Amino acid sequence: MVMTDPIADMLTRIRNANIVRHEVVEVPSSNVKKSIANILVQEGYVKDIEEYADGAVPMIRLSLKYNGKERIITGLKRISKPGLRVYCKKDNIPKVLNGLGVAIISTSKGIVTDREARKLGLGGEVICYVW
């Protein structure tokens, strides 16, 4: 079966595993997914990531983070979809929950957070919001 939106699949797997409080979640690997996972680690939403090969399919294992019984990730939302791409200019970069969350943006310099995009003065495609 052909997957039309692998990034949405990754976010949904993380969201579902987080809701039922799984310690780890595994997703098929790609360069974009690795970049998103690295941002989640860098921003403190995920403990760490591990790359491995499950047969011929490279995978990413994300260790989810919890604060006691509370989830660190309270929400994940895919913004730009294959059927409706959402772009922002450097002056219109969105803030998630007035800066408490993170917008992940694909720019010409790679995949960065909203704060990094503002600092670099870059716009791009808004991939998702995490809070």
Swiss-Prot record:
Highest taxon of the lineage: Bacteria
GO molecular function terms attached to this record: rRNA binding; structural constituent of ribosome
GO CC annotation terms, alphabetical: ribonucleoprotein complex; ribosome
Cysteines joined through disulfide linkages: none
Record-linked InterPro entries: Ribosomal_uS8 (IPR000630), Ribosomal_uS8_CS (IPR047863), Ribosomal_uS8_sf (IPR035987)
GO biological process per UniProt: translation
Assigned keywords, A-Z: Ribonucleoprotein, Ribosomal protein, RNA-binding, rRNA-binding
Keyword Nucleotide-binding: no
Xref: Gene3D superfamilies: 3.30.1370.30, 3.30.1490.10
Family listed: Belongs to the universal ribosomal protein uS8 family.
Function: One of the primary rRNA binding proteins, it binds directly to 16S rRNA central domain where it helps coordinate assembly of the platform of the 30S subunit.
Record protein name field: Small ribosomal subunit protein uS8
